[in-house]
Amino acid sequence: MSEVTNTTVPPVQQQRQQYYEQISAKGLTPLWESLHDLVPQTPNANCAPALWHYPEIRPLLMRAGELIGAREAVRRVLVLENPALRGSSSITASLYAGLQLIMPGEVAPSHRHNQSALRFIVEGKGAFTAVDGERTTMHDGDFILTPQWRWHDHGNTGNEPVVWLDGLDLPLVN
């Protein structure tokens, strides 16, 4: 007859705890312990549905052009701020959107930022954007992308105001 050794195996919970401590020391964490929080079964959005009507916003944007100079504003933008996210300058938990106005003769100084940006030209003629020195003329309905951390500026050499919708992943990368 063979001899059976009675070795005590730690309970599963104790083994797991030891394992978690071991991987934690290596800067690792198990996804299976947090997946339910990261990818919930139902939405847990903290923003509210919202609608902005451009014909209602446009006069307010043009008034900003009268009251706030380009140098003072740097970029004259009315942010579309979600009513449930007041104070966040966000349209959703991960996106920023705003309507930017650039008047004839104005230039928004060259700048760069960690966020990627998109611009949808709403109205006006004569404006441009330049990315890394390459200038592109903006036309109604154009969709322009600016990759993150690229030097870019905007100007209006035309004789009418130009408006575009800015979209940035600002809340996501900040």
Over which residues does each language-model region extend?
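A structural feature that tracks compact, well-ordered secondary-structure segments
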Residues: 97-100, 127-129, 155, 167
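Transition-metal
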Residues: 1-82
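A short beta-strand-loop-beta hairpin characteristic of the jelly-roll/cupin
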Residues: 103-140, 146-150
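Short histidine-centered beta-strand/loop micro-motifs
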Residues: 88-91, 107-113, 156
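A short glycine-rich, His/Asp/Glu-containing loop-to-beta-strand
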Residues: 66-104
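Hydrophobic or amphipathic alpha-helical targeting/insertion segments
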Residues: 151-154, 163
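A short hydrophobic beta-strand segment most commonly corresponding to one strand
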Residues: 100, 118-120, 145, 158-174
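A general structural signal for short secondary-structure junctions and capping/turn motifs
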Residues: 68-71, 137, 154-157
